[in-house]
Amino acid sequence: GVKYEDAKKILENVGLSVDGIKLLKTIHFLTESELAFPNIENITKGYICDLTTYYDFKSDIQKALDVLVEQKQLLLTNSNYKITTDEESKLLEEMNDFDVELFIKKRDMVNYLKKTGIFNQISTINDDAQPYKFNILTDQEDEISSSSNKQLGFTVYSLFNINGSREDFIEDLKLQTQYNKDNITLVPNIDSFQEIDRLISDIKKYSHMEEKYSTESDNTIKAVIREFSTIKEEAEKSLVSKLSDAYLNGSLIYMYDEILLNGDSFKGSVNETQRKLIKNIYTKRLNSSLSDSLAPKILIENNNDKLSRYFSSNDFAFFDKNGNFVGDSLKVVEEIGSKLTRLIDGKSLEQDLSMAPWGYTFGTIITTLASLFRAGRLIVKYNNQEYFSYSDKSVQEVFTNTTKFKLASFKSLNKSLSS
């Protein structure tokens, strides 16, 4: 028939030695006999005369099948091949006339990239027992895993935006970003780009056909659209897998360094680079942090000589053994103190000091303020009233309730000797 002749011509045109007529007859026989599935293994066995030549022929037959699927002579579902019917050919032709625009492909790629889940493992990293959430965006600022902390930047390049040679692209990128301390860039491997591009287009085309014929009453057409849905699902699985591979085997660029990634080293290599970034931008970070549960304890402790026992780290040696405040030269007191020259609300204080270069935790900020308040070094303004005494019960809730802390304001009270 015409289909058999077409298959023969198509394979001859691409220079394959597989006989198109014989190949389609083999598939037809397997489909009709129902003795074995028409998959690559059985088609190869049916095509050859001598079983010892199986491996000589298999890769060429696979290439021939791929070409015929691409040319819509065959349909591939669940690893089985079948010759397209006239109805299928007609619908496939109609489907092929549907054009998928580049901006749609770019958008769909981002959605499927999120579905790979590979960025979940690197979106938040713990360093010195403190979590840092990275702001992961594409190079066109599509969100993959966003964070309110824009200083922890992570750019993922779209496969569609790597122009020319990948090596040249990476060299240019290294030069452009060599002084950017606050951003890491991931460039995918582009070996499978053509296939990924084709899968994204095909999936969109199958979806278009599903929508167009969703209310179809003709059973023959309905059956073909059901087949299309199955093919689409398989294409989606294949796409997610290929996208994962492209990014897991990409290159990481940070301050002129290029780190080659693979599936096994991906998380470790990315985390190591993230720690470098954290170290580079949080230059005033402390070696340890405090828990916010300490703040109220400092205010209600009756024995001054017990105050120093609440703090084990030298970063927070606010009190001596007698309960005298001796923390003026501590880094944390100097840094927080520099923000307290005028009244500042708790919310702004936390927002500022949690960012680079400090990276202080909420617990560190609130407990340091509680210590300053205990030492008579702080004015707390709350509910339009100024408080100077730490023992005042009505102000203590500022240090036990996050919302109330954010609404309260704080200012240094400088202790100076009066004559």
Regions inferred by a protein language model and the residue ranges of each:
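Extended alpha-helical interface modules used as scaffolds for assembling large macromolecular complexes
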Residues: 1-419
